[in-house]
Amino acid sequence: ERFLNEKQTDLRWDKVILSGSSHGSTTSARFAKHQKVARVVAFAGPRDQLESWQSLPSATPANRYFGFTHVLDKGWTADHYCRSWQMLGLAKFGPLLNVEKVKFPFGNSRRLITDFDVDGNANKAHGIVVRDGRWKDVWKYLYTHPVDKMGKPVPTDPDCTMKIRPN
């Protein structure tokens, strides 16, 4: 009942957290552009590298989007995720932080990465951030950190290729 409005005819979207991994994170982030939600947690994504919807106006404020991925994930090495995170405006809420080097509360940033050893396996890297219990503190942060506590704005990442579409 806590997720239904008083008449029980619709969801109380302000209580809903959308989350997904890979393409599921893309779907979550894209949905939140149209419907204001409590927050969006994107694991290994969003991955819509050739589109520009990420920079469109959003029903969900940008400080409510959180991302976490592995640096060997092909979506990261090909600049898909960093591009999406920049287009979503996440640099306004703190720097890119490696959770292996910076601990909770991760500078109140919305952009978290890990370089945990996956034996150089990009496929393993893609799903590891949702499978390995070693990141319980990260998950708790992503799902419960107060959205009004934000890191300081930083410039966009000059190493992130923003134009991925071929000419």
Enumerate the language-model features and the residues they cover.
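Gly/Ser-rich "nucleophile elbow"/oxyanion-hole loop immediately N-terminal to the catalytic nucleophile
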Residues: 2-17, 155, 160-163
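Short beta-strand immediately N-terminal to the catalytic nucleophile in serine-hydrolase-like folds
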Residues: 15-20, 43
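The feature captures the conserved acid-bearing segment of alpha/beta-hydrolase catalytic domains
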Residues: 38-130
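Structured segments of extracytoplasmic/periplasmic soluble domains
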Residues: 3, 31-34, 87
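Extracytoplasmic/secreted proteins, especially bacterial periplasmic and envelope-associated proteins
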Residues: 26-27, 83, 137
